[in-house]
A protein has these predicted regions:
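Conserved beta-strand/loop subsegment of P-loop NTPase cores
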Residues: 7-11, 32-44, 57-79
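Generic, well-ordered alpha-helical scaffold segments in large soluble proteins
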Residues: 1-4, 8, 28, 56, ...
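Generic detector of short, locally flexible boundary/turn motifs and exposed helical patches
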Residues: 1-4, 40-42, 87-89, 100-102
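Conserved catalytic-core segments of large NTP-driven translation/proteostasis enzymes
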Residues: 62-141
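Amphipathic alpha-helical segments in well-structured domains
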Residues: 22, 50-57, 96, 100
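Conserved Switch II/interswitch segment of TRAFAC-class P-loop GTPases
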Residues: 2-52
Length: 141
């Protein structure tokens, strides 16, 4: 599935830190040289420890032989439940714009021919009660 994306937003819990599945997904993303954005989520929890979690995430990246460029990835602080994201922990709570802007600015745009016919590689078929059958895939053109 990671071969179908241009980058990843690695969501890490602000209290628990990187989990075993975090290591697995991050290793695959680094191996594919994907752009990484680290989102420290649940910063609104009283027991959150975002500074420690950032250090743990960077240590994990170093253990996985991340390049200097990969280590220089952006970190975003967020609360999915609260509906806000921040560039810095001390920034005011507003909306998710910092996360979306970071995705736009950091994840490379897909390459394709905008003048060509639409071309989609479907990787998964899903079903939704409201819209019916859904094809999930990567748009190439």
């Amino acid at each position: 599935m990671l071969k179908m994306v241009d980058g990843v937003v690695l969501v890490v819990d602000a209290y628990e830190g990187p989990m075993p599945q975090t290591k697995f997904v991050l290793q695959k993303a680094l191996d594919l040289n994907l752009s990484v954005i680290v989102c420290i989520n649940k910063i609104d929890r009283p027991e959150a420890r975002p500074a420690d979690v950032i250090d743990e995430t960077l240590e994990l990246m170093m253990d996985l032989d991340a390049t200097d460029e990969q280590l220089d990835c952006p970190f975003i602080y967020a609360s999915a439940r609260g509906g806000f994201a921040k560039y810095k922990i001390e920034d005011p709570e507003a909306d998710m714009s910092p996360l979306f802007e970071t995705i736009i600015n950091h994840i490379p745009a897909p390459e394709g021919d905008p003048d060509a016919e639409t071309q989609v590689l479907i990787s998964t078929i899903d079903y939704n009660e409201f819209v019916g059958r859904i094809g999930i895939g990567r748009v190439d053109n």
